[in-house]
């Protein structure tokens, strides 16, 4: 629990010290998104490197699929914070880089309360307020995997291949913001490993 609080505190500090607007580079239909600085590469070195290594040992090292003439280390290329208000959303999109991540810092709604709204109540695909990955299965069907949002997801994180399509659905009837941090991990082509 102590290390989780340390990580969250570090990320909240990044948010407090946020930089310029990042909206022009994002697919999001949201009012506020800002660049973040990972001071002294703390988050990258203490969290992301281990997660990338775990992903590579469990599945495949996606960096090996990038055509380069030599090996390169990873670098946290970009990191930003999104302040999502009700009715705002991120349409289906992917990212640049090799790996991407999202950390949910504040979730003011629950999936169950959102899906009790009249527009979703009788839906055969209730998804408002959720985060979703979209992918093609082995027979070519487009499928979705949903993360049902709730305050219990605060501090949760997902690392995924940057090219994996994903979306953030809007939430309704809540004046509080949803706050999330996202970023892209790329190969550092300025530094070759031999």
Predicted regions span which residues?
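Long protein-protein interaction modules used by eukaryotic assembly/scaffold proteins
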Residues: 15-23, 154, 189
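Double-stranded beta-helix
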Residues: 183-194
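Signature of the catalytic double-stranded beta-helix
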Residues: 26-97
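Short, small-residue-biased leader/transition segments that mark boundaries at the very start
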Residues: 1-7
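Catalytic core of non-heme Fe(II) oxygenases with the double-stranded beta-helix
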Residues: 78-157, 176, 191
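Short beta-strand His + acidic residue motifs that chelate non-heme Fe in jelly-roll/DSBH
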Residues: 90-93, 166-172
């Amino acid at each position: 629990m102590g290390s989780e609080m340390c990580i969250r505190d570090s990320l909240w500090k990044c948010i407090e010290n946020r930089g310029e607007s990042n909206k022009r580079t994002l697919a999001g239909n949201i009012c506020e998104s800002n660049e973040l600085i990972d001071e002294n590469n703390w988050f990258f070195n203490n969290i992301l490197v281990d997660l990338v290594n775990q992903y590579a040992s469990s599945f495949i090292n996606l960096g090996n699929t990038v055509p380069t003439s030599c090996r390169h280390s990873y670098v946290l290329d970009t990191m930003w914070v999104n302040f999502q208000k009700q009715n705002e959303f991120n349409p289906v999109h992917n990212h640049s880089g090799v790996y991407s991540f999202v950390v949910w810092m504040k979730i003011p709604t629950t999936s169950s309360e959102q899906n009790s709204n009249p527009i979703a109540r009788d839906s055969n695909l209730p998804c408002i307020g959720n985060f979703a990955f979209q992918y093609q299965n082995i027979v070519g069907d487009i499928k979705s995997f949903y993360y049902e949002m709730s305050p219990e997801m605060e501090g949760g994180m997902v690392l995924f291949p940057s090219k994996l399509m994903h979306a953030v659905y809007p939430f309704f009837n809540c004046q509080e913001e949803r706050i999330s941090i996202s970023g892209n991990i790329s190969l550092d082509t300025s530094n070759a490993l031999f």
